[in-house]
Amino acid sequence: MSKLEELIEKLCPNGVEFKNLQYLCGTITTGKLNANAMEDNGLYPFFTCDSNPFKINTYAFDEEAILISGNGSQVGHINYYKGKFNAYQRTYVIYDFKEINVKFLLHYLNGYLKEYILRNCKKGSVPYITLPMLQKFSVPVPPLEVQCEIVHILDDFTLLSAELSAELKARQKQYQFYLNNLLDIEKLKPQKIMYVKDLFEIKNGLNKEKGAFGKGTPIVNFTDVYKNRYLTKNMLKGKVTLNEREIKRYAVEKGDVFFTRTSETKEDIGMSSTVIEDIEKCTFSGFVLRARPTTDLLIPKFCAYYFSTNKVRDTIIRYASFTTRATTSGPKLAKIPVPIISIKEQEKIVNILDRFDKLCNDISEGLPAEIEARQKQYEYYRDKLLTFKELKVNE
């Protein structure tokens, strides 16, 4: 019998009590700042709804805390931090923990919060967290000795995953270096430089009532574009009910380049993704813009790589508008310069970058495959170790 099994047999053989999150921490609040309050080279972490914190020169919290993205493409993403930090007004900050090991709670939230959010949000809407929803999230509360032993086991898995992820991050940095250099306009010495307005027709996406989502025609959503440099049919999970007129008007074709239209932060505005294969009967969301090629001067994969270079990203950010959110539009994207080189040269660059892409992103081999395997192993043990029989209060 393992140490954990002995502790459970001794301390909670009949099950454990489940409690709502509001009873396990003294404070569940949000930050007060706009998402664009970050400062370059700031002294403190600034947590927004992005997966990684930015920097800022002021702090509003000095706590051991769990931070949860309240909306946006990373809704439900969880960070842990101990020390001085600041937070965006839609980022939840949880601290002053009672009866619960903060790392135990962290593992449990990572396992079950996102599913809970999707189950409790309004169908068809962009998922977001409300305070009552978070307060009512139910958590098993075994004795602290049991919690600590579970944390010890699961932390070993996450440590190994973190080491592998750090190695992959270094490889991705190298990949981005080659991407930026191979697609640098000055180094390419193009035949000529044109602009997006000369090469594409830009159109806003489809807006439908909430009840139309969930079945029907595949749809390119915000998250599909935000997370992927290029798109294939198998990557699309969302569906929407359309009539024939809408299917024709908001169609998706091979070579279409999509850009995210809004963002919580300026760094994430105008993320792009290119359709690299034919997709029959597909549409696109109003949260993205479609740039359809009007010439045959560019191949899809070249577009996929070019529009993700640092210089293009800088151009998109420079022309974007900022209020409480960052926004872009067709006329702003139209100003992006595009180098025109031969198809043969484009294919040569694509072949080089495809090899880097496979090394960094192909989950069937190398580091990505090992990270995927370790993550699945962690999730298996997390689900196994965090599953408890509920002990009723009167038992």
Tell where the protein language model's regions lie, with residue ranges.
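A short beta-sheet element
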Residues: T48-N52, I56-K114, K122, T130, ...
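Sequence-specific dsDNA recognition surfaces
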Residues: L24-E63, L67, H77-Y81, A87-Q89, ...
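Non-catalytic DNA-recognition/assembly elements of restriction-modification systems
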Residues: I8-G31, A37, N41-L43, T48, ...
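A short glycine-rich beta-alpha junction/loop motif
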Residues: F85-T91, K123-P142, K281-F287, S321-S342
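Short, conserved secondary-structure segments in the cores of folded domains
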Residues: C12, S125, E209, E246-K248, ...
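Long compositionally biased, domain-poor regions of proteins
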Residues: Y81, F104, N110, E115, ...
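Amphipathic alpha-helical segments
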Residues: G15-E17, Q135-Q176, L183, Q191-K192, ...
